[in-house]
């Protein structure tokens, strides 16, 4: 049986493209398919990537909920409806590939109840730079002589941000000659590889 993937994005979708390519011509061919792409930003280029690949897309933006219900209640309703949308799609796995919203218990508990796993890609090593601006913070730490390596990981999503159990971890050296742009490029290259590997590993483990 081919595993169905729902991919959550917020931006350019380069990691989404890596998954699509792997399902068409790589290690995921014949074992997984991206069946839906959901974005929280209408201008996310990843929506175009999905459309070009013939993958259905949808938009789920937070602002209308905040306007109607206020920030706190609006966010809870937004998250609850996000969970409903995902559950209706009945995916084998949900993949956060550059999704820039923290997933609250309002999302995670319904998914867990429906036995839908969710994984996230984070551009840092486990426990090193949780949260936002991880690459920038790692670069700054290297400039101060505190670290010589950073990395990327794919992990199971839990309520604590970027603290779920790692599935695959890849170290990335930080050279003294690296610019922030060079480091970003190295980390993104590692991300594209390990995200596909993690999906393959999960599917294999569940067979």
From Swiss-Prot:
- Give the E.C. number(s): 2.1.2.2
| Active site feature | 122
Pfam families associated with the record: Formyl_trans_N (PF00551)
Protein residues bound to N(1)-(5-phospho-beta-D-ribosyl)glycinamide: 13-15, 191
Q: Name one GO biological process term.
A: 'de novo' IMP biosynthetic process
Query: What's its catalytic activity?
Result: N(1)-(5-phospho-beta-D-ribosyl)glycinamide + (6R)-10-formyltetrahydrofolate = N(2)-formyl-N(1)-(5-phospho-beta-D-ribosyl)glycinamide + (6S)-5,6,7,8-tetrahydrofolate + H(+)
Give the first-level EC class, as a single word.
transferase
Gene Ontology molecular-function annotations: phosphoribosylglycinamide formyltransferase activity
Report the pathway entry.
Answer: Purine metabolism; IMP biosynthesis via de novo pathway; N(2)-formyl-N(1)-(5-phospho-D-ribosyl)glycinamide from N(1)-(5-phospho-D-ribosyl)glycinamide (10-formyl THF route): step 1/1
Q: Where is this site: Raises pKa of active site His?
A: 162
Supply the alphabetized keyword list.
Purine biosynthesis, Transferase
Positions binding (6R)-10-formyltetrahydrofolate in this chain are 100-103, 120, 162
UniProt lists the family membership as follows: Belongs to the GART family.
**Name of this protein:** Phosphoribosylglycinamide formyltransferase
Q: Which organism is it from?
A: Schizosaccharomyces pombe (strain 972 / ATCC 24843)
Lineage per the UniProt record = Eukaryota, Fungi, Dikarya, Ascomycota, Taphrinomycotina
């Amino acid at each position: 049986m081919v595993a169905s993937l729902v991919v959550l994005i917020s931006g350019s979708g380069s990691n989404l493209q890596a998954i699509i390519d792997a399902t068409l011509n790589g290690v995921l061919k014949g074992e997984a398919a991206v069946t839906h792409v959901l974005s929280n930003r209408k201008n996310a280029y990843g929506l175009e990537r999905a459309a070009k690949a013939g993958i259905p897309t949808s938009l789920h933006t937070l602002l209308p909920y905040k306007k109607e219900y206020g920030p706190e209640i609006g966010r809870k309703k937004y998250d609850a409806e996000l969970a409903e949308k995902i559950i209706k799609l009945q995916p084998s796995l949900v993949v956060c590939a550059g999704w820039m919203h923290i997933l609250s218990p309002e999302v995670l508990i319904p998914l867990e109840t429906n036995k839908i796993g969710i994984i996230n890609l984070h551009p840092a090593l486990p426990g090193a730079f949780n949260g936002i601006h991880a690459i920038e913070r790692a670069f700054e730490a290297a400039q101060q002589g505190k670290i010589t390596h950073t990395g990327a990981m794919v992990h199971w999503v839990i309520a604590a941000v970027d603290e779920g159990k790692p599935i695959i971890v890849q170290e990335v050296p930080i050279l003294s000659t690296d610019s922030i742009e060079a480091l970003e490029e190295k980390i993104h290259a590692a991300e594209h590889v390990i995200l596909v590997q993690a999906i393959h590993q999960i599917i294999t483990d569940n067979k």
